[in-house]
């Protein structure tokens, strides 16, 4: 018998050895779950609505009254592997030290060191091994036992450290222990992410590893029409990955609800707060039963994120991989050139000549404004470089196309603004070039972290101008911590009187010789009808028609 696209005979009860029976699990009688005192299906959320299609302000339920009416659920699935159990405290301490791992909280499970030790059921473990991973990352070694134990948790680790699988795989186990969705039910797992690009990437991982369990997922984000997302939600999805604003839209018009959510993930919590999503996050979380399991993931641990965790996590445990001090990956070579605005264009060409010596190069260039993105891209294409731009003025279809062209290497140069690039995770980026420096040191670290991921090496090049002097001291500190060469021209900005500002890196490897211009992009060098010096930008390279 099938129900809602999921095979009723797909039996996960053989997972009993990991935590007893799951109170019926996903193959139990759904009628017992649907026999709720509040009645009916969940469409319309708490309190219902008289007009299903009209936006209604979300009201926080009275959980003292509502929670006793809801069915109980299982969230602790962790059974410690005997190899893990037999490790001594000194061995565990040494492992955590080697992986720069800091923990806080009580009754924290020991870290695992192999996929088999995690205790995932075969239907999850087989998917992981099929991807060819050698061993878990540091955050996964400690994060999986934490998440599988059902505890609220905070995970702090650098971008690209494997955080997505740290919550995705335990989420799949969690779903398979719950009763099946009934018509009108919302998701069981909700993942909130700051950007549509990150949301789509999370969806890709959920689809890949949830396939064997026939788990459905839906990605809900702004910038595109709601119609397809509404259809997907109406069919029922165990996992919803969403940006906060669009999810609130869907909740207010009654197209989904959060009454079945028992596993909540806040991914890149620091970025969501940086982007001003705190009110939306609080409004969403208030709609979710308070006995849920909540997992918060972040690259940094500022006071705003700490406060959010204090307000919504219950007796959390925490793991941090790396220092709490802001730092850059030591796999990244940081090169900084102190330049004028008029020198940037020549320096950019120099580094592209170097990067292009690698036949599989990918270079991500950051600019400060949408206009500058387009200007740089136009100039590069006229000069024969295969460049495309991505920023907020482009519609979602074009953004997706540009990202795909960059990802598969057909256009190995992408120019982006910070907002457009947030959440983008593209494998194999060799170079990051900060044509314009970001507004703060955190964004600098986040930008250059697009290269040098998952053990690979990368190069970050930054053009630092006099206007960026406020970032000088912090930039130098980041470089020193990573044992980078600091150019003498930058050292004059090493003054503690400068507060937060913008780092500007530039740098130079010498070029490796000529680069044959690629055909088929743009229209040669002539005929550009504009002054390249507008926006303080291109300067005069002595070429005709510029």
UniProtKB/Swiss-Prot annotation:
List residues modified as Omega-N-methylarginine: 18, 43, 509, 512, 518, 525
| Catalytically driven reaction(s) | ATP + H2O = ADP + phosphate + H(+)
As stated in the Swiss-Prot or TrEMBL entry, residues carrying the post-translational modification Dimethylated arginine are: 509, 512, 518, 525
Write the gene name.
DBP2
The UniProt disruption phenotype note reads:
Results in defective assembly of nuclear mRNPs.
What more does the record tell us?
A: Present with 33100 molecules/cell in log phase SD medium. The gene for DBP2 has an unusual intron both because of its size and because of its location near the 3' end of the gene. It may have a function in an intron-mediated negative feedback loop regulating DBP2 expression.
Q: Where is this motif: Q motif?
A: 113-141
Q: What is this protein called?
A: ATP-dependent RNA helicase DBP2
Q: Which residue intervals are annotated with compositional bias (Gly residues) in the record?
A: 498-540
| Subunit text | Interacts with UPF1. Associates with polysomes.
* Region: RNA-binding RGG-box, residue numbers: 505-530
Residue stretches making up the Helicase C-terminal domain: 347-494
Q: Which InterPro entries match?
A: DEAD/DEAH_box_helicase_dom, Helicase_ATP-bd, Helicase_C-like, P-loop_NTPase, RNA-helicase_DEAD-box_CS, RNA_helicase_DEAD_Q_motif
* Phosphoserine, modified sites: 88, 90
Q: What is known of its domains?
A: The Q motif is unique to and characteristic of the DEAD box family of RNA helicases and controls ATP binding and hydrolysis.
The cross-references to PROSITE patterns, in alphabetical order and at most eight, read:
DEAD_ATP_HELICASE, HELICASE_ATP_BIND_1, HELICASE_CTER, Q_MOTIF
The short sequence motif called DEAD box sits at 267-270
Any Pfam family: DEAD
Q: Where is the Helicase ATP-binding domain?
A: 144-319
GO cellular component, as recorded: cytoplasm; mitochondrion; nucleus; ribonucleoprotein complex
Source species, domain of life: Eukaryota
- Which EC class does it fall in? hydrolase
């Amino acid at each position: 018998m099938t129900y809602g696209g999921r095979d009723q005979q797909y039996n996960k009860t053989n997972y009993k050895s990991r935590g007893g029976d799951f109170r019926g699990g996903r193959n139990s009688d759904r009628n017992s779950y649907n026999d709720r005192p509040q009645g009916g299906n969940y469409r319309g959320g708490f309190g219902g609505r008289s007009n299903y299609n009209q936006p209604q302000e979300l009201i926080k339920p009275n959980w003292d009254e509502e929670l006793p009416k809801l069915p109980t659920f299982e969230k602790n699935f962790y059974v410690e592997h005997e190899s893990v159990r037999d490790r001594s405290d000194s061995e565990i301490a040494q492992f955590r030290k080697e992986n720069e791992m800091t923990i806080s909280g009580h009754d924290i499970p020991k870290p695992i060191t192999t996929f088999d030790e995690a205790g995932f059921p075969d239907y999850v473990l087989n998917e992981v091994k099929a991807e060819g991973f050698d061993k878990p990352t540091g955050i996964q070694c400690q994060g999986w036992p934490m998440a599988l134990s059902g505890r609220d948790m905070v995970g702090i680790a650098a971008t690209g450290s494997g955080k997505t699988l740290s919550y995705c795989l335990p989420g799949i186990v969690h779903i398979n222990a719950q009763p099946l969705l009934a018509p009108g039910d919302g998701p069981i797992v909700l993942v909130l992410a700051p950007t549509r690009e990150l949301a789509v990437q999370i969806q890709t991982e959920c689809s890949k590893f949830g396939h064997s369990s026939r788990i459905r997922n839906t990605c809900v984000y702004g910038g595109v029409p709601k119609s397809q997302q509404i259809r997907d939600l109406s069919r029922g999805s165990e996992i919803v990955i969403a940006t906060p604003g669009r999810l609130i839209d869907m909740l207010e018009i009654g197209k989904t609800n959060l009454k079945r959510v028992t596993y909540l993930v806040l991914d890149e919590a620091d970025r969501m707060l940086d982007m001003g999503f705190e009110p939306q996050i609080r409004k969403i979380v208030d709609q979710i039963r308070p006995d849920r399991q909540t997992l918060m993931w972040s690259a940094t641990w500022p006071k705003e994120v700490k406060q959010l965790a204090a307000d919504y996590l219950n007796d959390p445990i925490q793991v941090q991989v790396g220092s709490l001090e802001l730092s850059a990956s030591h796999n990244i070579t940081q090169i900084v050139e102190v330049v004028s605005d008029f020198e940037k264009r020549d320096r950019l060409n120099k580094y592209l000549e170097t990067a292009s010596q690698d036949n599989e190069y990918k270079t991500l260039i950051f600019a400060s404004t949408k206009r500058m993105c387009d200007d740089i891209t136009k100039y590069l294409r006229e000069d024969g470089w295969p460049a495309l731009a991505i920023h907020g003025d482009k519609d979602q279809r074009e953004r997706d196309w540009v990202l795909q062209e960059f990802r598969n290497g057909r256009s190995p140069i992408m120019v982006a603004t910070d907002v457009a690039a947030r959440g983008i995770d593209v494998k194999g980026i060799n170079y990051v070039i900060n044509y314009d420096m970001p507004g703060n040191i955190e964004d600098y670290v986040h930008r250059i972290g697009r290269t040098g991921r998952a053990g690979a090496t990368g190069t970050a090049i930054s053009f630092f101008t006099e206007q960026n002097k406020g970032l000088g001291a912090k930039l130098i500190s980041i470089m020193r911590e990573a044992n980078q060469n600091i150019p003498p021209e930058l050292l004059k900005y090493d003054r503690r009187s400068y507060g937060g500002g913008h780092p500007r890196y530039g740098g130079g490897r010498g070029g490796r010789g000529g680069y044959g211009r690629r055909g088929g992009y743009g229209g040669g060098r002539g005929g550009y009808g504009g002054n390249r010096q507008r926006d303080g930008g291109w300067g005069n390279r002595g070429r005709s028609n510029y």
